[in-house]
Amino acid sequence: MAEEMIPAWVEGVLQPVEKLEAHRKGLRHLAISVFVTRGNKVLLQQRALSKYHTPGLWANTCCTHPYWGEDAPTCAARRLGQELGIVGLKLRHMGQLEYRADVNNGMIEHEVVEVFTAEAPEGIEPQPDPEEVADTEWVRIDALRSEIHANPERFTPWLKIYIEQHRDMIFPPVTA
């Protein structure tokens, strides 16, 4: 894995830190998460088996860390293209959240996350990069929580946190 510098806080100062170091030390760092929807479904990805943490687990459509100096919307669009071959969707910023979770092998995600959604029209289908994504699946939003409860071992810690604690921010209830 090439050295990748991401924005992380060290002694209260935001500075470039190598990504693996941020995870090993559990440093608070910036991240983005994207949820691509189509009607009442959301696109999930199964992380590639070669990932250094949480391999093979199901996550939201796309999540990553911005490069040092990269803004969140640019990062979100870049990663949607790189991981899933999805380009040109209008990203909607839904808000910011923070979480901390053990992700295995002594790694900790302590992320300040900018959350985005995007609606994918019919005909837009993911073309996953196999180095990043093992599989994809469109899942009904209203069934996702019960699927996570029934099979928690299949899902990343952050997706469980997002759906349990931040579902209404990510998927606001429809009002008449």
Curated annotation (Swiss-Prot):
Keywords: Chlorophyll biosynthesis, Cytoplasm, Isomerase, Isoprene biosynthesis, Magnesium, Manganese, Metal-binding, Photosynthesis. GO terms for cellular component: cytoplasm. GO terms for biological process: chlorophyll biosynthetic process; dimethylallyl diphosphate biosynthetic process; isopentenyl diphosphate biosynthetic process; photosynthesis. It is found in: Cytoplasm. Transmembrane segments: none annotated. Its cofactor is Mg(2+); Mn(2+). SUPFAM superfamilies: Nudix (SSF55811). Pfam families: NUDIX. Binds 1 Mg(2+) ion per subunit. The magnesium ion binds only when substrate is bound. Binds 1 Mn(2+) ion per subunit. The keyword Cytoplasm applies. InterPro entries: Idi_bact (IPR056375), IsopentenylPP_isomerase_typ1 (IPR011876), NUDIX_hydrolase-like_dom_sf (IPR015797), NUDIX_hydrolase_dom (IPR000086). Mg(2+) binds at C63, E83. Pathway: Isoprenoid biosynthesis; dimethylallyl diphosphate biosynthesis; dimethylallyl diphosphate from isopentenyl diphosphate: step 1/1; Porphyrin-containing compound metabolism; chlorophyll biosynthesis. It comes from the Bacteria. PANTHER family: ISOPENTENYL-DIPHOSPHATE DELTA-ISOMERASE (PTHR10885:SF0). Belongs to the IPP isomerase type 1 family. NCBIfam families: IPP_isom_1 (TIGR02150), PRK03759.1 (NF002995). Catalyzes the 1,3-allylic rearrangement of the homoallylic substrate isopentenyl (IPP) to its highly electrophilic allylic isomer, dimethylallyl diphosphate (DMAPP). This is Isopentenyl-diphosphate Delta-isomerase. The lineage of its organism: Bacteria, Pseudomonadati, Pseudomonadota, Alphaproteobacteria, Rhodobacterales.
